[in-house]
């Protein structure tokens, strides 16, 4: 459960849009990465509402949840589900703090899996993810979006993640949706809206 929530969280931060995707040229890819990296390195805080849709093979209906994500540079992340249930997960000080409808717990985040997940979530908001040596990256585009498709090189991550797509609207350098395919074939899509960049975030957002 914790790993699924954490993986979904990396889901930090683009769209499943049924347009034809084509590969970017080398020049286009370099320009895209440079632009995103330059713009997002100025991000100190980021907040957004989200809607998450999870499709699982053994369920006929998708599981839809919603909530709020808050990020504070360099590596503090809050992921709070509010509907249809309350569940919070906070990455802070090399630990993962969890509040499952009033039941609180913490997990050491220094394990390779949790450490990587946290790094990827934060990296997706500051452009550093593009240079992560544990992922191969392909760059695609369509009429409305630039797309970065990440495939894990690490055998450890491949146990959980098959592929992650970050979709950036053409006129933006922050992710508007994340689409993840797990090793099992289950998929998770997170759509972000009402995004606020560098707005003050109360300390209470990063505590349970």
Residue ranges and their predicted role:
Residues 130-208:
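Gly/Pro-enriched, hydrophobic low-complexity segments
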Residues 22, 68-119, 188:
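An acidic-aromatic
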Residues 17-51, 55-60, 204-208:
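N-terminal leader/targeting segments and the immediate start of mature chains
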Residues 48-50, 64-66, 163, 192:
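Extended beta-sheet lipid-handling architectures
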Residues 57-61, 88, 156-159, 184:
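Short glycine/serine/proline-enriched coil/turn segments at secondary-structure junctions
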């Amino acid at each position: 459960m914790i790993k699924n929530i954490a993986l979904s969280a990396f889901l930090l931060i683009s769209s499943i849009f049924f347009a034809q995707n084509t590969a970017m040229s080398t020049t286009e890819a370099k320009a895209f990465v440079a632009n995103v990296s330059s713009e997002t390195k100025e991000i100190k805080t980021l907040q957004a509402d989200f809607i998450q849709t999870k499709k699982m093979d053994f369920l006929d209906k998708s599981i839809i949840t919603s909530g709020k994500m808050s990020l504070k540079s360099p590596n503090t992340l809050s992921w709070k589900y509010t509907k249809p249930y309350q569940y919070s997960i906070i990455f802070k000080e090399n630990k993962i703090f969890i509040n499952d409808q009033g039941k609180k717990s913490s997990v050491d985040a220094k394990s390779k899996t949790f450490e990587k997940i946290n790094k990827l979530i934060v990296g997706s908001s500051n452009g550093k993810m593009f240079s992560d040596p544990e992922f191969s990256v392909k760059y695609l585009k369509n009429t409305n979006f630039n797309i970065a498709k990440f495939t894990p090189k690490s055998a450890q991550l491949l146990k959980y993640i098959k592929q992650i797509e970050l979709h950036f609207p053409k006129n933006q350098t922050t992710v508007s949706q994340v689409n993840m395919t797990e090793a099992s074939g289950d998929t998770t899509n997170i759509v972000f809206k009402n995004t606020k960049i560098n707005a003050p975030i109360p300390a209470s957002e990063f505590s349970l």
